[in-house]
A protein has these predicted regions:
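Hydrophobic anchor at the beta1->P-loop junction of P-loop NTPases
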Residues: 7-9
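ATP-dependent small-molecule kinase phosphotransfer cores
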Residues: 36-106
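Small-molecule kinase domains that catalyze NTP-dependent phosphoryl transfer to phosphate-bearing small molecules
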Residues: 105, 122-123, 144-193
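ATP-binding Walker
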Residues: 15
């Protein structure tokens, strides 16, 4: 099995980490999107579906599809449920990521994950944190998910690592308060540091 160099991209909700990763993909690099893969596993991995149903009840799935808004409400009201859910999902995502790396065959891969620092991800060779001011983050989340209230967005932000902690535990910080063309320049700088 070939070992890939793993560049982890992290940041809080609305920071622009997914946009950064999409720009990285346009330059020919492979990106593993942890949240997307976790949702895929939570919808397709039979034992995981059963465990989530036991943990959250029948409302966890609607017509065989994960009821994400119900799960989100539950884990914000009961922090212990979040910890239990993470203990079910994270090991499977880690396994899936390692399999994906092996299948990609790439020397360098990128991994997008909001929880790189919180979970002390051991697969990361280089950590990049994307940060943005709170108002910018709120506007971005409202634009893509208008059903989420501003107070809920602020609540989510308050549960995530502060930018000062990200700065302390990252190899590179990318400030993303501007437009995509400004981010393009920062992607090129990032690639020059890791390639």
């Amino acid at each position: 099995m070939k070992t890939s160099k793993v560049i982890c991209i992290t940041g809080g909700i609305g920071s622009g980490k997914s946009t950064l990763c999409q720009l990285i993909e346009t330059r020919g690099y492979s990106v593993y999107y942890s949240d997307q893969r976790a949702k895929l596993l939570m919808n397709s991995q039979h034992n995981l579906v059963q465990s989530i149903t036991v943990l959250f009840g029948e409302s966890a799935y609607e017509s065989g599809t994960l009821n994400s808004s119900f799960i989100a409400d539950c884990i914000f009201k009961q922090k212990d449920l979040r910890v239990e859910l993470e203990s079910l999902v994270h090991p499977l995502v880690k396994e899936d990521f390692l399999r994906w790396c092996n299948e990609s065959g790439d020397e360098i891969v990128f991994k997008e994950s909001a929880l790189v620092l919180e979970t002390k991800d051991k697969n990361c060779h280089f950590i990049v944190s994307v940060i943005a001011d709170e108002n910018t983050r709120i506007k971005r989340v409202k634009k893509r998910s208008p059903e989420i209230s501003e107070s809920r967005i602020k609540e989510i932000i308050s549960t995530q690592y502060a930018d000062q902690l990200r700065e302390k535990h990252s190899h590179l910080i990318i400030e993303n308060n501007g437009k995509v063309d400004e981010l393009e320049v920062k992607v090129d700088y990032l690639l020059s540091k890791v390639i």
